[in-house]
Swiss-Prot record:
Protein name, UniProt field: Serine/threonine-protein kinase ULK3
SUPFAM superfamilies referenced in this protein's UniProt entry, alphabetically: MIT domain, Protein kinase-like (PK-like)
Gene: ULK3
UniProt-listed SMART domains: MIT, S_TKc
UniProt GO BP: autophagosome assembly; mitophagy; negative regulation of smoothened signaling pathway; piecemeal microautophagy of the nucleus; positive regulation of smoothened signaling pathway; protein autophosphorylation; regulation of autophagy; response to starvation
Catalytic activity: L-seryl-[protein] + ATP = O-phospho-L-seryl-[protein] + ADP + H(+); L-threonyl-[protein] + ATP = O-phospho-L-threonyl-[protein] + ADP + H(+)
InterPro entries per the UniProt record, alphabetical: Atg1-like, Kinase-like_dom_sf, MIT_dom, MIT_dom_sf, Prot_kinase_dom, Protein_kinase_ATP_BS, Ser/Thr_kinase_AS
């Protein structure tokens, strides 16, 4: 956003124009290169007079880190210069503004849009984590968007960043209180996991329109941060089970109980495997080749599963593709694959009716034999609820979650069950439930793929992500 005040400083090779923002010891300007290319950049001008020892250390850290890393979701430091009055960081220009403004203009973001941004942020954090770098000041204001339309997230402002191994601990207060982990504010020891808390706050703000510790005064903010109460998630808007689980695990006050980096990167809501990228289309086409082969062999169930898996990559491929002609060609292919998957679904559905009838007599015998095992009874009852919901047509994520919870418990019980008739029945019941859960999972994926393909989700996400 342009601002008034004194004229921008002079920088050799560049013309500084509008002021984009002002911080504690720096002002950022939009600038144009004087060469033929007229390259557009952002120039961070740091007044030497404003620097104290701590800010000098922060600046040197930022330059050192940004000079040595290159990543598509981290703002690039192109060069740096200095004169008698200023130090200049010449950086990649991001025309889409910052994530804070993006959220504020929309009040809240749809979960699907928030997930795309989260995947990109996770991608940047994994790169930093692999290089033992912690940002320590993650907040929406430090997350820039590359363009107004179909933006790519760019992590910026590494003034507080540190080279930190997973076992390193710090004591110095860094970052912005609204987004800082409780262990930082309380001046206890902290480590790299503080960045995961900040990710949770950013995701919470994107989904609900405000950070969890939003306050009218610093005293109120401090009380909320120092409280032992668990973070409560609003009931509206409703979240998917995976999204809710991730938020709760990120916003765990106790860093020892908080989700780890490895668990975060592997979490199903983050789902880095299916984030839009240059390899999405290749992975999708490889799966289609396998699907066609299984289809020709007459294995309808395997073919359907492979088509569904391929569609999970085609959707991010659509989102990643910027060329309109290629995008339309992909969309046409996706439509054809969805049509074939629909035909296979009908074939598999007729076979699945037999599956729905399986296990009923054996299940009743197993329940009778489990009366002296309350834990087994409870797990079988949960499985029965899942089966009943599915037979009533409630073939949704809640039913699948019931299947998964009951199977998790039953598998543990099977491992401890001695040899005998009950163990045989339990093993057979688990096999039946696993088959039903797998079929239900394919049905859910199929519906999602249909929605994505037929309604051109990629374009709807793009319009949701476009700055007006």
């Amino acid at each position: 956003m342009a601002g008034g005040g004194c004229a921008p400083p002079r920088l050799d090779g560049f013309v500084l124009t509008e002021r984009l923002g002002t911080g504690t010891y720096a002002t950022v300007y939009k600038a144009y290169g004087k060469r033929d290319t007229r390259e557009v950049v952002a120039v961070k001008c740091v007044s030497k007079r404003s620097l104290n020892r701590a800010s000098v250390e922060n600046l040197l850290t930022e330059i050192e880190i940004l000079k040595t890393i290159r990543h598509p979701h981290i703002v690039e430091l192109k060069d740096f210069q200095w004169d008698s009055d200023h130090i200049y960081l010449i950086m990649e220009f991001c025309a889409g503004g910052d994530l804070s403004r993006f959220i504020r203009m929309r009040r809240i973001l749809p979960e699907k849009v928030a997930r795309i941004f989260l995947q990109q942020l996770a991608c940047a954090l994994k790169f930093l984590h692999d290089h033992n770098i912690s940002h320590l000041d993650l907040k929406p204001q430090n997350i820039l968007l590359s363009t107004p339309e179909n933006p790519q997230l760019k992590l910026a402002d590494f003034g507080f960043a540190q080279y930190m191994s997973p076992w390193d601990e710090k004591h110095v207060l860094r970052g912005s209180p609204l987004y800082m982990a409780p262990e930082m504010v309380c001046r206890q020891q902290y480590d790299a996991r503080v960045d995961l808390w900040s990710v949770g706050v950013i995701l919470y703000e994107a989904l609900f329109g405000r950070p969890p510790f939003a306050s009218r005064s610093f005293a109120e903010l401090e009380e909320k941060i120092r409280s032992d109460r668990a973070i409560e998630l609003p009931s509206r808007p409703p979240l998917s089970p995976d999204c809710r689980d991730l938020l709760q695990r990120l916003l765990e006050r106790d860093p020892l109980k908080r989700i780890s980096f490895e668990e975060f990167f592997a979490h199903p809501f983050v789902d880095m495997e299916h984030m839009p990228g240059p390899e999405s289309f290749c992975k999708a086409t490889n799966l289609v080749v396998e699907a066609v082969k299984k289809d020709q062999e007459g294995d309808a169930s395997a073919a359907l599963s492979l088509y569904c898996k391929a569609l999970e990559y085609f959707v991010p491929a659509l989102h990643y593709e910027s060329d309109a002609r290629r995008k339309e060609a992909i969309r046409t292919k996706v439509g054809q694959y969805i049509s074939r998957a629909e035909e296979l679904k009908a074939l598999v559905a007729s076979k699945s009716k037999n599956l729905l009838q399986q296990g009923n007599p054996a299940r009743e015998i197993l329940k009778e034999m489990a009366k002296d095992k309350p834990r087994l009874c409870a797990a079988l009852e949960m499985a029965s609820v899942a089966v009943a919901r599915e037979e009533e047509g409630k073939d949704d994520g809640d039913t699948l979650e019931l299947y998964q919870q009951s199977l998790g418990e039953l598998l543990l019980l099977l491992a401890a069950e001695p040899a005998g008739r009950r163990r045989e029945l339990l093993h057979a019941e688990i096999q039946t439930l696993m088959a039903r859960a797998e079929y239900l999972k394919d049905q859910i994926k199929m519906r999602e793929a249909q929605s994505m393909g037929k309604e051109a989700l990629a374009d709807s996400v793009r319009s949701s992500c476009t700055l007006q």
